[in-house]
Every structure is written in C-alpha cells, then in structure tokens.
Amino acid sequence: MKRSRWSHSGSSTARLLLIGVLFASCSTAILGAQRPPINSAGGHELRGTTFMPALECYDPYGRPQKCLPEFINAAYQLQIESTNTCGEQNDNHFCIQTMNQNHKNCEFCKYNDHNPSFLTDLHDPQSPTWWQSETMFEGIQHPNYVNLTLHLGKSYDITYVRILFRSPRPESFTIYKRTSESGPWIPYQFYSATCRDTYSLPDSRAIRKGEGEAHALCTSEYSDISPLRDGEIAFSTLEGRPSGINFERSGELQEWVTATDIRITLDRLNTFGDELFGDSQVLKSYFYAISDIAVGARCKCNGHASKCVPSTGMHGERTLVCECRHNTDGPDCDRCLPLYNDLKWKRSTSTEVNECKACNCNGLADKCFFDANLFNRTGHGGHCLDCRENRDGPNCERCKENFYMRDDGYCVNCACDPVGSRSLQCNSHGKCQCKPGVTGDKCDRCDNNYYQFGPHGCQQCGCDSGGSHQNTPACDTETGICFCKENVEGRRCNECKPGFFNLDKNNRFGCTPCFCYGHTSECMTAPGYSIVSVTSNFNKFKERWTAADLNQREVDIKYNQYSRSIGTTAQGNEHVYFQAPDRFLGDQRASYNRDLKFKLQLVGQVANTGVSDVILEGAGSRISLPIFAQGNGIPDQGVKEYTFRLHEHHDYQWQPSQSARGFLSILSNLTAIKIRATYSVQGEAILDDVELQTAHRGAAGHPATWIEQCTCPEGYLGQFCESCAPGYRHSPARGGPFMPCIPCDCHGHADICDSETGRCICQHNTHGDNCDQCAKGFYGNALGGTPNDCKRCPCPNDGACLQINEDTVICTECPKGYFGSRCEQCSDGFFGDPTGLLGEVQTCKSCDCNGNVDPNAVGNCNRTTGECLKCIHNTAGEHCDQCLSGHFGDPLALPHGRCDRCSCYEAGTEQDEQSITRCDQVTGQCQCKPNVIGRDCGECQPGYFNIRSGNGCENCLCDPVGSYNSTCDRYSGQCHCRPGVMGQRCDQCENYFYGFSSEGCKPCECDESGSKGFQCDQNGQCPCNDNVEGRRCDRCKENKYDRHRGCIDCPDCYNLVQDAADLHRAKLFNLSQTLDEIARTPVTNDDEFEAKLKAVQEKVAVLAQDARDNSGDGGQTYAEVIDDLHKHLDSVREHLVSADKFQADANGEIDRARQNYTILDQITENAKKELQQALDLLNDEGAQALARAKEKSVEFGQQSEQISDISREARALADKLESEAQFDLKNAKDAKDAVEKAHQLAKSAIDLQLKIGTELRSEVGLELSHVKQSLGTVVQTSKEALRKANEVYDTALTLLNDVNRQTQPEIDISQLKKDAVAANERADELLKQITELSNSNGELFADFETEQELTEALLKRAEQQQLEDIELLERAKAAHDKATKAVEQGDNTLKEANNTYEKLAGFQSDVQRSSESAEKALQTVPNIEKEIQNAESLISQAEEALDGANKNANEAKKNAQEAQLKYAEQASKDAELIRRKANETKVAARNLREEADQLNHRVKLTEMDIFKLEESSTKDDNLVDDAKRKVGQAKADTQEAQKQIEKANADLTAIKDELENLKDINTGDLDRLENRLATVEGEINRVNLTGRIEKYREQRTIQKNLIDKYDAELRELKDEVQNIGLISKALPDSCFSRNRLEP
C-alpha cells in the first residue's frame, strides 16, 4: 500500500475517522472504511493493502453469515491514464511556487520524471514522487482541462477517494465514477470556489433528508490556494447523505458507492492573479501536480464473498472476481447458482444472510429460475429448466407428453406410430393402441403374415409356414412377399429354388440342394429310404475305434467294461484324437444336414481348446471346428453331450468354408472322423455313445425324404448320375463321378472305350487312349480314320521315327552316340566314322578328355579324331592331360584336373614369347633371372639387391671393413654400416668421425672452444687453436690457462714452476739414462754394498731360525701363512674382477639411461600430439553432442531429458578439459622425475668416482642391490597403476550404462525408445573412441615406465621426492574420482522435475562458473607445455652431464688399473682432476635441482586449480542431484496419473460393456452403475491431467530458453578452445637451445 500523509489535512482525516466509527457501529458494507491507510507495502495479490480484515462467510459453527472482502487501497500500483503529462512531447520548463515571488526555482521536466505511474506507487515522504502536468505557459487552464482515469478492473464498493497534491490544490475539479466499463461517467463530487459559476451547482456539503441522495454535491471547502504543497482532499462517498446510517436498506446508496472506474477532471488552476500580466516565468509556475491518489474500497461481492481472486476471462485477460459463497455466482456474486433459485436473490445483510436455496429438481436438472407465481402458490419459487430423462414439471416430477414412466422411474418416449396407432399416447407400460393387422409396442409395423401398412391397418399374406423363415409366416409389409428360408422361393414360400428339392418344415434351410455329382440341377425325393443312425455304444468292446496324434502315430485305447466306454491318454503334450471305424466312413451323403453326436469326459485335465477339435476328412479335403462350436460347451471332468450339424452354412463354423457341393463331396467319400481326446499335457479322455444320423434304402423306420433321385441328362446313368452311358467316358479319364461324360473318340480305329479311363481298344498299328498316334516303329497320320494311316519306320532296330513332311522321315530313337535323320552321324561328345566315308567303318565312341571339359558344352572334341577342343580347369593337350603354360599341378586328378597359376614375381622371373611367366608344371618352381632366388623368384640372393630392375639382382659390393655383413637393402642397395660409417657401400667415415676400421669410425669430439673446426684428421687429431694442444684440443699448453679465453699466459710467478718442472725433467732424463746403463751393464763393484748384503743375510738366517723355533709348538708355519696370503690375494683378485664386471654393467646402464632420455623426447612430442587430438575431439564431439540434445528437445519437448542432456554435456566438457589437464600434468611430472633422476644419476656418478679403489667393489654391489629393489618397486607400482586404470575404465563403463538406463517422463514412449537406441549407438561410438585414445596413451605410458625401470638402479636418492609428487597427483586424482562418483550418484538418483525453474536458474550460473573453471584449466595448458619444454632442456643438459660422467668413470677405471700397476702418482693427479671436474658437475646438478623445485612448485599451483575445479564440480552435482530428484518425482507422478487414467478407462469400458450386456433393466443395476460412473469421474478429475500438461508445457518453454543460453555459452567455450589450439600450434615442437655442462 502506498504510504500516505494525513497531517496536512487534519480536518478531513478527523472526518473520515468519525464516519468510520459511525459505519462500524452500524455494521455496514464498508466497515472501517474511513480509517486512514497505514504505512505498508503488503496486501492483495494484485494490489492494495489490507486496512481491515475480511469477514468470513460462515461462523465457527458452519452457519452462514454476511461476509465482506478485506478493505484495501484499490488504486495501489494501478496504471492511471493521463491526458496531459509534462515532458511527454518535449522537456518542459517549470518553476516551483513559493511565497517569495522575487525568486523562483525553475527546472526542466522530463516524461520519466513525473509520469502517471507515480500517482499510485509507494508513497514515501522522505523520497517523494508525483505526477505533473504541463504549465499554464503551455495552455493548461480553463476551459482546457486534464483527465486522470483509473480503471479498477472490477466493481468496488467505494468508501473514499483521497488525493494528495504536490502543487496547490485546483480551484475547480471533479471526481467521476462509472459503474461498468461501457457505462456513462457519473459525477461523484465537484470541488470549486465558484460552484455556481463553474458547475451551475450550489455550494453544499450535505443532502437534506427526503431528497434524492444519489447525486453529486459541489463544495468550496478545498479550493483555497493554500497550502502551496501537500494539500489534501478526502472525498467520502456517504458523507452528507442521510440514508448512510441505513446503508443496508438503501438500494440507492448501494448503487451510489459502486464503481468500476474513477476519473478526476482538473478544470481550473488556483492562482495569485499574476498570470494576467503574461510573464512566462509566472505562467510556468502554475501547473497540476499530484503525489498520491488512494481509493479506499472493498471488492463488491454483495455480502456473499470474503475475498476476491484473480481469474482468466474468456479473452485471456486477468481480472478480479469474487470467490462466491452462499450458493451465489457471478463476478460480484450478484446472482444465484444455476440450481439455487428457489428463493429470489438478495444482497446479504447483517440481519439476513439471504443464502440462495437449491431448487428441488429431483436430480434431473442442472439449472432453474425463480418463478414468482409458483412461489406465491407453493412457497417455493424454483422452477426447473431443461429437465433430463424426458421429465417435465416445476420439479421434473412427471413425464413429458407422449412419454410414459417405466417401473424404474425413467420416462421413455411412447413413439407411437401415427399411422398404425389409434392414439399417440401409450399406456403405463409403453404399449400403443394398434389398428387391425398392426403390431408392435409402437404400432409401427404389420403383424406377422400381414402386409401393406396403411391408415386402415394391414392385410394378411398367407405364407407357407414350412417354407417361411424360422417356420413363422411373415412377409414384406409393402409387397406382401413372404420371407422364405434360404433355399425356398415363391410369393408364399411354397416352392424349392431351382437345384433344390424336398421342402421340409424341419429343415432350417427349407430345401436340400441337388447333389447329382454336379451333372444336373433337377432332382426329387428318392423313394425307399428310411432314417437310421450309425452308433457306437461300446457295450462289449472298442468297436474298432482307434486313437492317434496329428502325425498319425498310434496311441493305445483302453476299454472300460464297467462304464462301457473307451479312453486314451497322451504321453506328452501331443494332441490325441479318437478315430472312427469304417462303418462311419465311406459314402455318407445321407448324413448331410444331419447330426454327429457323442459324449466326452476329461480326466484330471483342464481343456485348452483349439480350432481343430473335431475333424472330417474326405475327397482330399479336410474341415474342422472347435469343440465349443455350434453352442457346445468346453469339455471338463463331467460327462458332456456334443452335437454337430453337418452343413456348410457359416453359422455351423466348419473351416475352411465350403460350398454345398464341396461339403457333399467330402461326405461322399468320408475317409476319417476325428474327435480330439486330450487337451493338456498327458491328458486323458473318455468317449461314449457316438451317433451319426444317416439314411439307408430299405431299412425300417421313418422315411428319409432328403435323399435325392436325379434326372440325368444324355450320357449319364445312375440314381445320382454318377456313371456314363455306353459310348461315353468321364473327362478327364479316371476323374471319378464328378467329371462330365463325353462321347468316346477313337478316330475310327476302335468301336468301344472304357467308361472310366476312356481308353480305346486300338487297331491298324495305332495306339493311345484315343488311337490318335501311330504305334512305335510306325509313322503316318493316325487321325485319317483309315486302316492304312500308319507305315513302318526306316530306322535301325525298328526304332521310332517322325515324319516331317511328305518326303522326310527322321529317326527319333538313335542309339547312344549317334544322331542324324537316319542315325548316320556321331553325336556331340563322340567320334568315329559310322558310314565309312573316310575309310573303314568305325563305331561312335565317347571322347576321352579326362573330365576337363564342360559336359554341358557343345563341340568339346573333334567328332572324327576325338581330339579335345575345349579344355577347362587350366588344362591343355589332345586329351586335356597337361597344364596350360604358366600353370602347374595334376591335370589328371579326380574328379577334374587341378592346375594352378604359377605364382611368380614378374620382375624376377623369366618370361616366354607371349610374356607369360614360366614355372615347372609339376613343382611350380619359377624360372628365375640371374641372382634371384625363391619359389616365386621374389628375392635377391644374399649380397644382392634391386630385383625391381627386371634384369635380375645387382651385387651390393658392401665394404667388408665398414659394414656389418655383405647384405644390403633389397631395394636401395644401402649396406648396413658400422657406427660412424656412411655411404651406400659403407666405405667412408661420417663427418666429424675418424679411424675407418672394422669397429666403425670414432667421433672426433673436438672441443668447441679449443678447436678451429669439428672435423679431425684420419688419426683423430683436431685442428687446435694457438696455445692449445691435445688430440681433442681440450687443454692449454704448459704455462697457459683458461681455454675459453684462448689459453692465455699464466702469471709470471708460474715461470718459477716452469723452471722447476724443466729441472725435474732433466733429472728424470738423467735417471732414465742411468737406469738404462745399469740394465745394459748389471755388474757392480761396491765393497760396501757387499758388506751390507752379508749383514742382511745374517739377519735373515736369525729370523729363519726364530721362525722355526716359534713353529715348533704346533702353530702355523710361515709357509702356511704365505699360502693363506696367496689365497686371500686370489680372493681379492676375484672380487676385483667382479668389480670390473659390475662397473661395466653400470656403464651399460648409463648408456641405456642416455637412450631413455632420447625416448623421453619422443614421449613429450607424442604427448603434444595427444593434447591436440583431445582438443580436436572437444571441437567435434562436443558440438555434435549439443546439437543432438537440441534436436531431441525440439522434437519431443521433454524438459527433463534436455536438462539431463545439457548437464551431461557440460559435465563431459569439464571432465574432458580436466582430463587433458591431468594428462599434461602427468607429462610434466614425468619430465620432472626424469630431471630429478638425471640429477641423482650425475651425483651417483660423482660419488662413484670419489670411491674408486678399495670402495669400488662394495659401491657397485650396493648399487646393484638398489637396482633389484627399485625394479621390484617399479613392477609393483606398474601393477597398481594398471589396476587403477582398469577401475577407472569399469567406472566409466558403469556410468555409461547408468546413463543409458535413465528414462524421462515422456508421453510418446515409443519415440523415446527410438531416441534411446540412437543415443546408445552414439554413446557406443564415443566409448570406442575414448577406449582407443586410452589404449594409445596406455601404450605410451607403458613404454615410458619400461624405460624408467632401466634407470631406477642409480636413482635411489630421488625416491623421496618422487613419493611426494605421487602423493600430490594422487590427491588430484582422488578429487577427480570424487567428482566422477558424485556424477554417478546424481545419475542413479534421478527422481524429480516439478517446480525446477528456481533450481535451474541457479544451475545456469553454476554451469557458467564451471565453464570458467574449465577455461582456467585450459589456460594452464600453455604453461604446462612450457614446463615440458624446460624439462626437455634440462634433460638434454643432464644427458650431456651423463656423457661426461660416463667418460670420467671409464677414465677412473683405467686409472685404478694403472694404480694396480704401481702408477700411483699419475693416478693421484688424475683423481685430483676428476674431483675438480666432479665439483663443476655438482654445481650444475644443484642448478638442475633448483629448477626441478620450481617445476614442483608449479605442479602444486596446478593442483590448487584442480581443487577449485573439484569444488565447482561438486556444486554442479548438488544442483543436478536436486533437479534429478524432481525429474524422478515428475516421472512417478506421470506414471501414477497414467495408472489412474488407465484404471478409469478400464472402469468406463466395464460400465459400457455391462450396460450393453444388461438383459433385464432394473433401478438397482442402474444406480450401481451410476455410482461407479461418478467414482470414475471423480478419479479422472483428481488426476488433473489438463493442469499437469499445461504446467509441463510452461516448464518446457522455460527449459528451451535455458538451452538457448547454454548453446551461446558453449559457442563461447568453443571459441576459447580454438584460441588455445592456436596457442598450442604456435608452441615450438622441441627446445633448440641445449646447453652442455662443462666436462
């Protein structure tokens, strides 16, 4: 409710309060209406704030009482129409009116500043808004006026209209009302300081008693110009009207307060009079401005409703209507409900509720009207309208005229025929009074056997009862022609139709058809036949009855002598039949239209009947019917009698249907009567008292009049015309009695013929059934009819012949191998000279082609010589006994030759003149060209190549020194070169290599800084820079240093060292010469030396004696000690050899590690390719998946399915991006691990150098043990990784299956299944692609892990760091698994989709956040790739460091060996050099470790991004779970509704069927069915199917809008992915700057 201010108009407020108290005491319809509105924004659903609560229509005890809707501000937030608003056309300049006329504050007004919407908005004095008109400057002044129109949209009881002005109050204005939307405007109140002059009304504030109170007053009370702002006017609709105190009894005032529209007309502005001077600024200060309009009112409901509710009208507009009670109706409750007009409608008052009373229509009408006359007579004014069930009267208490009431109370139309009835009114039983000859309850037809319905009644027909339908005489009511039986005709139905005989009253069809085997239609009753029956009572035995199944497998029959019946039992589930004996079979035409009877009883089985329970077979036909046909019952454990009429009529249900002739044909030669015995598995049945009604000639009994005596035409004989007369025969022959008889035709060569076969007894050398051919060996025209028609044939062996014309006769039965008109030639496939034209006569013999010709072909061999001409199966030769050229095999194999094409390599095989490759016809060995080998000549000899030349193979000419062997590539001739060797023949060193030998060429390895170039000479000497020396130019000359600066001179202080070194070299040279001299002359002449030597000998002797003395007590002798020392020395040597072996193994491991890092480069490149493939897959498959979801949405409109598709697509996109990020992180981790391992490898090499000597043996042994331990760890880790990969795959497969199993609440179930199949097929394709991608990556990672195992032996110290990284990635993987698990749980718990709009709105924003997270994950891809490149650079550096370490290790080994040979001093120098180089390597390794730490930090940052992505995914899953629960609920609701509807349909069908099958109609049955119908109707209404469908359609529209938004978001994601793809393509494929560590 708009907040109002009342303080500026205390008098009007006090008046409203006073009136409110007065009306409250009188309980008027506007109770409390005058209380000022409070500060509130609440209220009605559409508008207003409740000032006073509603009064309910029923008290706590359920008794009706007057009720009122809540009292509200009816104008709140309604749009007001204004005919003038400032700024509407252009911005208006206006000035604010103040008491200071010398200074005015002027502003510009724009339309949006003060438009009419501010008249009814929330009024806040702290932030006022108002409507404002244009100024007097624009012409706003009398006579021009401004209208403000408020459309309330419904009639209200108006209490007051309050107007709060922002400008001074007008000098004159008017309030109008309208009581209907199309009604006239009625003045409500005039305000003017000049009432008489302006409105021609006196200035008055009240109406005197006795005057009309429903007219407007004019008052000058509120026309003063003061106050200049916030002046208020409050108009009360009942103020000053005397009858207001009795409002409930004043219809005039009740109409007065009613309004649907309010209009305020502003006629004249209040001014100070200064506008007369025309000052523009003064004119712009006068305008209308209103800050608030409030209308205090109640929804008009005439005291019969407590609230108004929004309703949708016929044209779709939303309006308020009263929620009527007291059995009232209408928007204002201004009338009674259609069936509640027993009292006249009245407005409810505080003393009289005036509740509408129901009319008494006995439940037979839905509406009535108030009949004042009826009310005056009876006290009840309800007169029923449109009575149902043909009722009439004020209370539908009697039947209409010409209707009668049945016993059940229903009125039925008499419907008496006006022609045949004496009166249109019937009696109480509905029977009309008929004229003579007329019958029927309605007198609408002639009676049986009467016709010519007319005003005088009907005439008698005189029909024969025996020939009339159902033996009841009746005729056509117009023509008088009787209704005859099927085979009867005549006006009186006293004649058989042509082709029928024996008019019989007991014959349903009247007459019996003439059978006569179809030769005539004239017959009569044959005399001498009597009615008999063929029976089987089984009094003594089985009477030759048998039993068999449908496959004629016999089944035993048991005879029960006590019950005198037969029985049989099935062994399984086969159908067993009783079969009648011969006396029931044969010619049984006399049983036509008679009965077959028997008794059947089942034992312990329930009958599962079929369509062939009783079978008749005969004349090659078979007919059958079910056991329950012709009104018979289903067999059970009781004895039942069965009767079947043998007639073709469709009512008797014999199938297939037959004509009368067809049925009689079966009976004329009845071959089997079968009665089904078993109707279940191992069923048992009993048969008794079988009877077949028939007739026999000469038997005692009643005459059988249905047996025919045929009148045969010429050529036929017999009672039934079944035989041919002499000179006639059946055609065709042996056709039986059904075939016609024709005269015998023997062409003059015989006089008689067989009547059945028609065969003539021929003479005159003729034969044939009709003597129409010459006998064998004779020729001529046997049809001539003379004895000399046939002559003997001129053929060998009296063979048959054929006459072509008068002069030509051809033999037709030549011996095998002969042909020709006289059998004078050999046939095709034979050879010889039967006439001796070429010499001696030769008989015709079969050609011998060894089965290698087509027996169906013509001309396989020469008919004279027997040479085979058309060999097949790749054979050739005179008798097809050889293989064709270019083929080999066995041409004489059985059943035909087997010659296969030579499989020769064309370029390596010799060819014949026809360019056909040749091979041995037995072995298939091809004829090879020079230096070519192989069965197909497809290979060169070892040491040869270029087989494609077509000239044989060329010699490789591989250099025996530079190649591994004499072989080369079979096509290019490239020999297999040793390391460092190149050239096609491996005969020269590669660039930067030297020393061509059997071991290959060695690398020059020229130092970069010390060499002039990298190419060395043949001795390996590199070209050194000045002051540089060494083979590799890798050291400065003496007294020079700093090779990188060009080996500059050492400081001067080193000159002393140089001098000392030269002095020592001189001394060493002299010492060397002295030693050489001693070696040349070993004799010495030194007495002193001799003396010392003697003294030493004496000491030795003493020591020897001491040794002997010391060993005398059983201890070890020195000799034994020496032996032990020798053994220990041998052991040391063995350990040393083992150490050498271990060191060699370590060197091998180092070499393999270097190879592994090369492989790592390849792995990195592969990883980049896989990343690009993943991006391409996202672009293609992601777009396709969304397109499919949109197509399904448009086609089916099922919001729940589209939500699931959208969420799955979004999740799949996020998962795929996250998977790619995980994959890149894995590559980065692998690269980091490789760097760490390289660092540890270099350090291990350094440690290995420091421990050369006595610690070498133990160090290598320890390293090897670490290798074994690490190998076990790697194997276990690989198995664990494989297990987890399988678990991930199984989880993905399970998720896919769960998605395929989800269903949505869709009405078109069949179409949904089709879509599901299509979706499953597409899902299978995607799964296959994912699996292939996973497999390719699995092989890539498996290769990397395999190579990693080889380097684990020397990387022990990296294990701890590796474990930390693994733990880090495991946490990321666990987060991903957690998100995947959440998705699975969401898919499995999909349950509800009602009221999902709010959730989906949040879902959209979450999907957006998820997309942003996915973008962040994609943005990390370039960083990851950069880290991979950095890792590659570090790997390269580590590889170079390993090369140096390897070389150092080799040098260390060599130095150790030299130490063993007593070169200790040189070894010490070398060791010192090694330590210095190792320190340099250590510094480089430390730098690598720092870079690896940085890489580890980046990995952790990436892990944080993954954690954020997990949180976003979890939020998404929660929202999806909620939406899916709603989908499940919608599905359950839909299924429940469907069940209820199906149940209702079933109930309706049952009610309908019961009504149709209701034989005797009674009130109880109808009431019961009516109750059931009402129950079904209530169930259908409770389902509220229409409301649910409408709700789903609205949600479908909402979901479609969401899908459009998601489509736009996906397009943005695709653009981002494309940008990332471009960035990825721009990255270099490898790192080209690889710094080498200082050796």
From Swiss-Prot:
The keyword Signal applies. SMART domains: EGF (SM00181), EGF_Lam (SM00180), LamB (SM00281), LamNT (SM00136). Residues 533-709 form the Laminin IV type A domain. It is found in: Secreted, Extracellular space, Extracellular matrix, Basement membrane. Residues 299-358, 359-413, 414-460, 461-513, 514-523, 710-743, 744-792, 793-846, 847-901, 902-955, 956-1003, 1004-1049 form the Laminin EGF-like domain. Residues 1-33 form the signal peptide. Laminin is a complex glycoprotein, consisting of three different polypeptide chains (alpha, beta, gamma), which are bound to each other by disulfide bonds into a cross-shaped molecule comprising one long and three short arms with globules at each end. This is Laminin subunit gamma-1. It comes from Drosophila melanogaster.
